[in-house]
Amino acid sequence: MLFLFTISAYFIICSLILDKSKKSVLKDQIGINKEHGIFPSDFFSIYGSSCYFNMGVLCIFSTLFVLLINGDLNGPTIGAIFSMAGFGCYGKNLANSVPLIIGVSLASLISISDINSPVTVVCILFSTGLAP
């Protein structure tokens, strides 16, 4: 858990260091969240190092989600979290990921397995791959 938050903090700090003005990172984050993520949407070529901030936010959000539902932080779950963070540079943001997470979480309530089972957690996190 601490490792994931450290990686997230690293992404956020890198975006603040690499960007000239700190206000532009937050302004770019608002712009990133307004993007639809339709192919091609390379956030790095559009927003530069501000996309690292988006990667850190997605990593923190997905880790907190797993902890909130009492899911296990095992290998596949951490891989799914890194997948979310990685695609934060190419089309994925909170605005297009949260509706999918909510929808799959609601769908898991009528399924056989619990919402915090490893299979369901990995399905929820990888379903955000539909977002970009």
Descriptions of predicted regions:
Residues 1-132:
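Alpha-helical multipass membrane-protein architecture
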